[in-house]
């Protein structure tokens, strides 16, 4: 397995990190345990210091529909920023897949949180084309979501192969 510390980041501009932000929340959408965020912070900080654009990819809960507001990261973004101690650019998956990278200022590294990956049918179906539509926009994919790695889902299975 390759280590991030051994990579040459000179030609790496866009990095996707599969994180596990499936955090427990209370009835008021307050995060009750930040352990999963804390575990990802070191890797995110390391790549952030390499001046790359970072795209955080995660699931949250088990939504039964394509979009369910109660499983949207939009309700948690402020808490994520407080815990992780950096600003996040929240973008929906539709925007990312269509033009997300084109809309970002690549001269100024950005950390973006993509909407809940489980809103998209291709995730659960482990769809290769869905995976490629994301990884084709990336120079590097990092799986930091070891707790989700047993899933046969696109973001932990197919993306690692692309």
Regions found by a protein language model. Name each.
Residues 1-162:
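Active-site loop-to-helix "anion-binding N-cap" substructures in soluble metabolic enzymes
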């Amino acid at each position: 397995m390759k280590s991030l510390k051994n990579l040459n980041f000179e030609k790496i501009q866009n990095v996707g990190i599969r994180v596990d932000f499936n955090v427990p929340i209370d009835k008021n959408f307050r995060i009750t345990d930040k352990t999963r965020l804390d575990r990802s912070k070191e890797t995110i900080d390391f790549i952030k210091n390499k001046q790359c654009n970072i795209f955080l990819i995660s699931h949250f809960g088990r939504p039964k529909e394509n979009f369910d507001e109660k499983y949207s990261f939009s309700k948690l973004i402020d808490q994520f920023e407080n815990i992780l101690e950096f600003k996040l650019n929240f973008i929906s998956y539709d925007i990312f897949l269509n033009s997300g990278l084109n809309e970002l200022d690549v001269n100024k590294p950005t950390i973006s949180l993509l909407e809940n990956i489980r809103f998209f049918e291709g995730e659960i179906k482990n769809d290769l084309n869905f995976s490629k539509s994301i990884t084709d926009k990336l120079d590097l994919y990092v799986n930091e979501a070891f707790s989700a790695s047993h899933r046969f889902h696109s973001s932990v299975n197919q993306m690692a192969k692309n």
